Amino acid sequence: MAKKRDVWITEVALRDGSHAVAHQYTVEQVVKIAKALDEANVPYIEVAHGDGLAGSSLQYGLSRTNELELIEAAVSVCKQSKIAVLLLPGIGTMKDLQQVAGLGAKMARIATHVTEADVSAQHIGLAKELGMETVGFLMMAHMAPVEKLVEQAKLMESYGADAVYVVDSAGALLPHEVRDRIRALKQHVGVEIGFHGHNNLSLAMANSLVAIEEGATRIDGSVRCLGAGAGNTQTEVLVAVLDRLGVKTGIDLYKMMDLAEEIVAPMLPAPQEITRDSLVLGYAGVYSSFLLHARRIAEKLGMDARDILVELGKRKVVGGQEDMIVDVAVEMAKKRAESLVQ
């Protein structure tokens, strides 16, 4: 019998964690992890390329195994957990959504930049038609004022989303900023609210707890912190903390501890740490994809890549605007040269 839950956790190690293993998951690994998560009574397990359905590419990183095989394998071993997928319109297509629904995925999480919810309308609509639980995923949530976030969440709600997430893609939000956003959504949006954190400033756990305090009932976690950058909120730790707080997750804590230690840890190429790189991404509030570009141009111009990333963050440059990195760096180099002449 399913345990009562106050908060519904989605485990993202098999999607966000794909970044940490360079998208090299095998069917055997996915089966092992998904089966253990199912036995621990985790309600949702997200499986896909790190950048969502159809993300396998030279630009985003090639998958070792076709994600459809991974999704099918996860579905086959889960008796109670539902398999979720992430789809970014423009990368994943309506056809991709239909395929995974046919394989048995039960939840679709449709992700857009925080100011671009309008591009999710068709995909949310299709997911609902396919009978999938449907989530709106507003990424880079630190880049929009609270009023804009509310407006965009209401759009996703109007398209049929069952829940809307505040997604801290860059791990840049501070606890009071999470509080303001979740509180506003709870006041103005009629569906469930969720939070997806990244640990680049070591705040994923604190931010998740603040979100729950403000009424979020959907929280993302990643076992052993396996995710992009410094990883996500560590699921087994989150379950323990929520248990101490009297918040019911319905998840077996000891089984989560064991699968983290015995199954996931040996698969990691390196422990998830807050490195200089992930820290600067959280500090600057920019996409991780900017890092290598900034490094290359900084080397050519004799600059510190961190200065470029911080300036890009100030200008609120978003994913897809990688060409701006060169423009901003050249402009900064010119200013520096002028100041030396003076």
UniProtKB/Swiss-Prot annotation:
Catalytic residues of the enzyme: H19
BP terms from Gene Ontology: catabolic process; L-leucine biosynthetic process
Short name of any one Pfam family annotated for the protein: HMGL-like
Entries under PROSITE patterns matching the protein: PYR_CT
Keyword Transmembrane: no
UniProt binding sites for Mn(2+): D16, H196, H198
Family: Belongs to the 4-hydroxy-2-oxovalerate aldolase family.
Full protein name: 4-hydroxy-2-oxovalerate aldolase
The encoding gene: pheE
